[in-house]
Amino acid sequence: MVKVAVTGALGRMGSGIIKTITETDGLDVVAAIDIPNHPKKGLDIGELTGVGKIGVALSTSDELEVVLKESGAEVLVDFTAPAPCVNTAKTAAKLGVNLVIGTTGFTSEQRAEMENAISENKVAATISQNYAVGVNIFFKTLELLAQKLGDYDIELIEMHHKFKKDAPSGTALRAAEIIQNNLNRDSNLIFGRKGITGERTKEEICIHALRGGDVVGDHTAMFAADGERLELTHKASSRQSFISGVILAVKFVAEKKEGIYNTFDVLDLN
């Protein structure tokens, strides 16, 4: 039985992950952590997430180290925000707890700080902007499209619910990174357009971020040339698509001793 801790336990992803873990053979929720001074601290996380009492009280991040030690957590799943996630990762790594990181929006410095802590403490971690299986097939397909249609004009469009805090999405940025890594030409990433921009240059790869309603996550990569246009789209209709991938990542990283992995590793797409 893999003992799992979840931070951001009452967030959109965290609560769904906890529900799914309770329904998954071989996994056990042993700790649930949220923000300091949370008004529901001490209440049973199973009851808070609608699965019934499981005997695990909601804890807060200011007591993270104690909670991880006492619970015996082997894997910690984090879907929070960049700054708290870095602190959580450093604490967990120091205690020998493996990590599944789904938080997005890191600066390069935050990402480096987190990865250094993981490497220095010789734990294992998966870090991904999107754990959905379909999205990772989307990513893999982009490698081929960038290689074969590299001379086309390339645009990326993403849409999310009105509550999303970062833009563009981590998934869109990862898609752009994959495209750039597989082009046989120079490219320049830009974000939206405004004013008299002039003729589009061949080097441009533009990301457009849309926000509204309750959209879980839509991503489209467009490759356009004179006379034709190819569009590759992934649409998530519920967070369960992400959660299913997280469960795979938890099982994957639980068997690793050290190293930093991504969802291509989890899904054997490399």
From Swiss-Prot:
Q: Where in the cell is it found?
A: Cytoplasm
Annotated residues that bind NAD(+) are located at G8, A9, L10, G11, R12, M13, D34, G102, T103, T104, S128, Q129, N130, Y131
Query: Does DNA damage count among this protein's keywords?
Result: no
- Pfam family example for this protein? DapB_C
Q: What class of enzyme is it?
A: oxidoreductase
The record ties this protein, via SUPFAM superfamilies, to: Glyceraldehyde-3-phosphate dehydrogenase-like, C-terminal domain, NAD(P)-binding Rossmann-fold domains
Gene Ontology biological-process annotations: diaminopimelate biosynthetic process; lysine biosynthetic process via diaminopimelate
Reaction(s) catalysed by this chain's protein: (S)-2,3,4,5-tetrahydrodipicolinate + NAD(+) + H2O = (2S,4S)-4-hydroxy-2,3,4,5-tetrahydrodipicolinate + NADH + H(+); (S)-2,3,4,5-tetrahydrodipicolinate + NADP(+) + H2O = (2S,4S)-4-hydroxy-2,3,4,5-tetrahydrodipicolinate + NADPH + H(+)
Q: Which domain of life is it from?
A: Archaea
- Assigned EC number: 1.17.1.8
GO MF terms here are:
4-hydroxy-tetrahydrodipicolinate reductase; NAD binding; NADP binding; oxidoreductase activity, acting on CH or CH2 groups, NAD or NADP as acceptor
Kindly list the cysteine pairs connected by disulfide bridges. Answer: none
Gene3D superfamilies registered for this protein in UniProt: Dihydrodipicolinate Reductase, domain 2, NAD(P)-binding Rossmann-like Domain
This protein's pathway reads: Amino-acid biosynthesis; L-lysine biosynthesis via DAP pathway; (S)-tetrahydrodipicolinate from L-aspartate: step 4/4
The active site consists of H160 (proton donor/acceptor), K164 (proton donor)
Sorted alphabetically, which keywords does the UniProt record give? Amino-acid biosynthesis, Cytoplasm, Diaminopimelate biosynthesis, Lysine biosynthesis, NAD, NADP, Oxidoreductase
Which residues of this UniProt protein bind (S)-2,3,4,5-tetrahydrodipicolinate? Answer: H161, G170, T171
The record's family statement is: Belongs to the DapB family.
Against PANTHER family, the record matches this protein to: 4-HYDROXY-TETRAHYDRODIPICOLINATE REDUCTASE 1, CHLOROPLASTIC-RELATED, DIHYDRODIPICOLINATE REDUCTASE
Described by its record, this protein's role is as follows:
Catalyzes the conversion of 4-hydroxy-tetrahydrodipicolinate (HTPA) to tetrahydrodipicolinate.
| Protein name, as recorded | 4-hydroxy-tetrahydrodipicolinate reductase
- Its source organism is Methanococcus maripaludis (strain C5 / ATCC BAA-1333)
The gene coding this protein: dapB
